[in-house]
């Protein structure tokens, strides 16, 4: 299970301006910025809630620089995105390999593990068979026993039982900030991954403003 919410994207204006610095081609820029809604000449809604409406001249240059490689597409690293992601610990373990250009703030398992009772929906279990779900439910019951004893006695020994018994299917929420270069790398490296969470996450990334238009030429 993976859930992506509270997505925010910014930085198109300065990224495109900087993209045109090497050739002093600012006069060729045809994008519109800070637009909530934009209507064409036939009164048809073209875009809504975008930080920018990228013109075809700018988009063409963005595509060519993207194809030219990381040393030429520095503008991608100037477009930022933040989002809240809820995903199992086994997925976060792999996400944590993306260190450069990413910042993460997580809900604390260490501090908040005993705050509420454990429930089945706190875990990713959609691929488990019936017998395996029963095993997980038994584990949840035991975790809740350790939780009650910890809250009753304040003994750290019970806290340790929860920490070391907690399975990697436990879902954790984090707020992530990264840039479009990170986005492109993740899509390229993970869109056909064995884990469903990676496939679904890449699909969410492809929905970000202009990601597909840049990477796949529309």
What kind of region is each of these model predictions?
Residues 1-218:
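Family-specific signature for flavin-dependent thymidylate synthase
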């Amino acid at each position: 299970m993976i859930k992506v919410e509270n997505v925010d994207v910014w930085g198109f204006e300065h990224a495109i301006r900087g993209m045109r610095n090497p050739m002093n081609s600012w006069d060729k820029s045809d994008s519109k910025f800070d637009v909530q809604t934009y209507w064409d000449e036939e009164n048809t809604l073209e875009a809504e809630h975008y930080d920018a409406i990228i013109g075809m001249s700018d988009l063409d240059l963005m595509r060519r620089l993207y194809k030219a490689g990381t040393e030429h597409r520095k503008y991608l690293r100037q477009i930022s995105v933040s989002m809240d992601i809820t995903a199992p610990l086994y997925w976060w373990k792999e996400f944590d390999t993306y260190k450069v250009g990413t910042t993460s703030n997580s809900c604390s398992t260490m501090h908040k593990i005993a705050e509420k009772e454990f429930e089945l929906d706190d875990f990713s279990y959609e691929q488990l068979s019936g017998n395996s779900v029963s095993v997980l439910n038994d584990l949840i019951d035991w975790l809740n026993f350790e939780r009650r004893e910890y809250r009753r006695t304040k003994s750290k020994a019970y806290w340790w039982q929860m920490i070391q018994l907690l399975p990697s299917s436990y879902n954790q929420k984090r707020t992530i900030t990264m840039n479009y270069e990170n986005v492109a790398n993740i899509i390229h490296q993970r869109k056909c991954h064995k884990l469903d969470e990676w496939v679904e996450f890449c699909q969410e990334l492809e929905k970000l403003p202009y990601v597909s238009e840049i990477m796949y030429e529309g």
